[in-house]
Amino acid sequence: KRHGKRPCLVPYGVSSPLGAVGYASAIDEIFTQSRELDFRPTAIVYCSGSAATQAGLIVGAALAMPETRIVGIDIDAEPERVRADVIDYGHGAAAMLGTTLREADVEVVAGHAGPAYCVPHQATIDAIKIAGTLEALVLDPVYSGKGLAGLIALIHSGRWPKDSDIVFIHTGGA
């Protein structure tokens, strides 16, 4: 500031309305690729912790893919806090993009975080083994492993019809 510049502070997990706008634009890539490959995602599932990613995905999907549900798997064992943060960042991102956030579109699924943040449970370890063995996909026990464990549980529960196209986003961490 002393030099006449406008510094940009980047919070943990890029958790801000502006950070959410970045993931709103990620929906454009998913939209383009799904059309090129001739499928329409029923849902996009990912692990939700710092909340801006999910907020951005929801705002972006509302604009480009309104038929697609965004499902966040809580990885912090704090689903109420995560949902509140998604709503907060989502309203801010939506305002930046000239739209609104429907709070009914915010879904944070609890029960897959294990005992606490950074502490995996058996379903997470199993999901990591499945992904590595069947797809050569490297997952970590803090984020993506918990997210995939949640997705597997939702599939086994019959959440979606068997012919549904579900996109799992691996945001890193491994």
Regions found by a protein language model. Give the residues of each.
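Active-site/ligand-binding-proximal alpha/beta "capping" segment
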Residues: 2-48, 121-134, 141
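Glycine-rich phosphate/pyrophosphate-binding loop at beta-loop-alpha junctions
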Residues: 20-107, 169-174
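C-terminal capping/lid region of NAD(P)-dependent oxidoreductase domains
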Residues: 162-170
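Active-site-adjacent helical/loop segments in soluble small-molecule enzymes
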Residues: 103-163
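Short glycine-rich anion-binding loops that position phosphate/pyrophosphate groups of nucleotides
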Residues: 13-15, 50-51, 113, 144, ...
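A polyampholytic, Gly/Pro-enriched intrinsically disordered region
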Residues: 1-3, 91-97, 131, 161
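Short beta-strands and strand-loop turn motifs
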Residues: 7-13, 72-73, 108-111
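Short, small-residue-enriched loops and turns at beta-alpha junctions
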Residues: 15-20, 79-80, 114-118
